Amino acid sequence: MKEKVNVTGVPETMVQTLYARAKETRKKNAKINDEIAEELVKNLDYDFSKADKDKAMNYGVIARTIVLDRMVEQYLEKNANTIVINIACGLDTRCYRMKGKYLHWYNIDLPETMKIRRQFLAETGPIYQIAKSAMDDSYIDDIDYHCENVLVIIEGLTMYLCEKEIRKIFSIIEKSFQEVTVMVETMSPFVVNHVKEKSIEGSNAKFTWGVKNGKELQRIVPEFSVQQEVSLVEGMKELMPVYHVIGKIPIVRNISNKIIVMEKHG
């Protein structure tokens, strides 16, 4: 029997991005392999019709998955015994694709979101679940931390927040860990103000915040330094070969979402 899912607003985006990964996995020449997402979609009682028609959302999710999977895997290969904190995890399954490459993995999201995750994914170690907001500093108490290296992933969240909330999230991270790297997805202000994704608008979630680049983000969270910026154009190149050409155009790279790598050293 399929499980009914009732979500609206920003939490609903987790179901739509899950569908995008499952849909790509089913393709003959799939660029990602997310069998867990495929299985979850089969067991969800949810109308995926808007997500299925939203090509922009689908391409964006897969491009982001390609880029972040690559970046996280490379990081974990260089940094043994890392604690990974996945903020606003939704129904993300990267922890399974990276299994065996980290010490502990903590999936964090709002209680109503984690209630849905627990229906389908029982995680009891080395993958753990924390049902709290990333702006609630008590989530740190649920992390078994003894000065290990920490990687924080913030994917698909910042564009729904405001600058004050961004500062709060980074402040908690900065105060809690001695050595920490943050991989955060950001959206350009142009896209926030002028672009609408059909499935996102249908969920009543709205884009509200963006930054042009890492330097702009560093001005907001000066305790961190920018180490790297990777445009999601790099993922689009694997989905649409034309991006090998148009991806060189500055405006295309500038308005594409980015993964910005920030570091704080003790």
Which sequence ranges carry the predicted segments?
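Core SAM-dependent methyltransferase catalytic element
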Residues: M240-G266
